[in-house]
């Protein structure tokens, strides 16, 4: 089964025909034309003209680059082997630093959100220009634009297999796009009475959860598009929402300056976290890998609990990032350093660090065990509105990795993908690679 779309197949065939025609391979040209069953007319302005030569040149250039990198790697390994300490940072500890590997341009208004595909080198971006764009983050190449929303697209998320992409917009709609069917818009969800600020797939991918300026959080069934329940409690615009990895808890942040925790099964509030002094823009549950470092920071024993959702990070317009114990509702640490609104958060896969992006144009890296800011990355020329760390599961689905909602001891670990993406009001996306 070919992985190429019909359009990609057509372009490939025409590129091959173009090459054969240009080099007077008449017999092969006629044979391919008949076999492929396509109409071909030489056109020097067509996108497939000279494409094979360009791709071949790119492959040679990449092979040369690979050889150079392999030689460089061998030299570095030799240096390490001769070093007494041999304490160079491992790939597991990689952190982004300037300059960015790729700068992706094409959006015509500020970026609002970005999401990595869980299996392939695909990145989706949302913008105030009403579109979603699909990119190859490894090469930095643009792939396609998804049109359907009529107002700014505020957030997006892939399901755990990467088959579906969900988006939400100020046009009040939530849409699902099928990556296996030419990225067609296959479902539309209605129910919110104002701009939809955030959307996420719930673990299991059967439900989605959304947050809105109408002050509510809503849960929808993916298959039927029906609304399952409404969660009410915030007194102002709900800016963000995210489920815990096992789906037993939701966290939301609001213009009312609070973070709230919810039971998604009943819709009942569990607790309210107060401490921010302005709109809460971002929330992120800490992965289990971060528990030891956060407990060290909090000065509490590390009991090796594997339950999800025990700790939470929040970022707000008060320029701070806060770490919370969701069981007690207590704030563990206030991370201050940004000079403007904090817009997005991402935990490092190792669990050692937390990354935050801000309207001060930077990304900051916080060491969780000490609360110190280890690095400041001058990321963009304008506000950094979106931040994401690459995700890639290694073989097993989420349901196969858990027993009664808890990580199995025998679960295969997720593959760490060292790539970070940032999106900005400067209308660009930057890809940060080792």
UniProtKB/Swiss-Prot annotation:
GO terms for molecular function: dynein complex binding. Its main location: cytoplasm. PROSITE patterns: LISH, WD_REPEATS_1, WD_REPEATS_2, WD_REPEATS_REGION. Residues 57-83 form a coiled coil. It is found in: Cytoplasm, Cytoskeleton; Cytoplasm, Cytoskeleton, Spindle pole. InterPro entries: Dynein_regulator_LIS1 (IPR017252), G-protein_beta_WD-40_rep (IPR020472), LIS1_N (IPR037190), LisH (IPR006594), PAC1-like_LisH-like_dom (IPR056795), WD40/YVTN_repeat-like_dom_sf (IPR015943), WD40_repeat_CS (IPR019775), WD40_repeat_dom_sf (IPR036322). WD repeats lie at residues 106-147, 149-187, 191-230, 233-272, 275-334, 337-378, 401-434. One of its GO terms (biological process) is microtubule sliding. One of its GO terms (cellular component) is microtubule. Residues 8-40 form the LisH domain. It comes from the Eukaryota. CDD domains: WD40. PANTHER family: TRANSCRIPTION INITIATION FACTOR TFIID, TRANSCRIPTION INITIATION FACTOR TFIID SUBUNIT 5. Dimerization mediated by the LisH domain may be required to activate dynein. Self-associates. Interacts with NDL1 and dynein. Positively regulates the activity of the minus-end directed microtubule motor protein dynein. May enhance dynein-mediated microtubule sliding by targeting dynein to the microtubule plus end. Required for nuclear migration during vegetative growth as well as development. Required for retrograde early endosome (EE) transport from the hyphal tip. Required for localization of dynein to the mitotic spindle poles. Recruits additional proteins to the dynein complex at SPBs. Belongs to the WD repeat LIS1/nudF family. This is Nuclear distribution protein PAC1. It comes from Coprinopsis cinerea (strain Okayama-7 / 130 / ATCC MYA-4618 / FGSC 9003). The lineage of its organism: Eukaryota, Fungi, Dikarya, Basidiomycota, Agaricomycotina.
């Amino acid at each position: 089964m070919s992985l190429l779309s019909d359009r990609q197949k057509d372009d490939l065939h025409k590129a091959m025909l173009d090459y054969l025609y240009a080099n007077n391979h008449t017999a092969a040209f006629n044979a391919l034309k008949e076999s492929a069953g396509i109409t071909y007319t030489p056109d020097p302005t067509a996108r497939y003209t000279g494409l094979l030569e360009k791709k071949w040149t790119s492959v040679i250039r990449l092979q040369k680059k690979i050889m150079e990198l392999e030689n460089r790697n061998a030299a570095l390994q030799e240096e390490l082997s001769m070093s007494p300490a041999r304490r160079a940072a491992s790939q597991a500890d990689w952190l982004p630093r300037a300059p960015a590997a790729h700068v992706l341009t094409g959006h015509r208004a500020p970026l609002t959100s970005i999401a990595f595909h869980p299996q392939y080198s695909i990145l989706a971006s949302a913008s105030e220009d009403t579109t979603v764009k699909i990119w190859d983050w490894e090469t930095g190449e643009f792939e396609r634009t998804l049109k359907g929303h009529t107002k700014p697209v505020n957030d997006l998320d892939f399901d755990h297999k990467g088959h579906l992409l969900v988006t939400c917009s100020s046009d009040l709609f939530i849409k699902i796009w099928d990556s296996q069917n030419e990225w067609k818009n296959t479902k539309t969800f209605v129910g919110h009475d104002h701009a939809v600020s955030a959307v996420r797939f719930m673990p299991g991918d059967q439900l989605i959860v959304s947050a809105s300026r109408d002050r509510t959080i809503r849960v929808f069934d993916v298959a039927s598009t029906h609304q399952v329940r409404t969660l009410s409690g915030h007194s102002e615009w709900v800016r963000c929402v995210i489920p815990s990895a096992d789906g037993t808890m939701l966290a939301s942040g609001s213009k009312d300056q609070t973070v709230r925790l919810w039971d998604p099964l009943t819709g009942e509030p569990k607790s309210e976290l107060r401490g921010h002094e302005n709109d809460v823009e971002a929330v992120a549950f800490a992965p289990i890998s971060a528990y030891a470092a956060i407990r060290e920071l909090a000065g509490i024993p590390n009991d090796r609990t594997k339950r999800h959702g025990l700790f939470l990070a929040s970022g707000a317009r008060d320029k701070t990032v806060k770490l919370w114990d969701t069981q007690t509702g207590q704030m563990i640490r206030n991370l201050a350093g940004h000079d403007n609104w904090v817009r997005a958060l991402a935990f490092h896969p190792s669990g050692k660090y937390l990354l935050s992006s801000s309207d001060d144009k930077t990304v900051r890296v916080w060491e969780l065990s000490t609360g110190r800011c280890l690095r400041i990355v001058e990321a963009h020329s304008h506000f950094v509105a979106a931040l994401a760390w690459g995700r890639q599961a290694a073989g097993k689905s989420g349901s196969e990795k858990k027993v009664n909602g808890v990580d199995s001891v025998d679960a295969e670990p997720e593959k760490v993908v060292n790539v970070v993406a940032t999106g900005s009001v400067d209308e660009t996306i930057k890809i940060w690679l080792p």
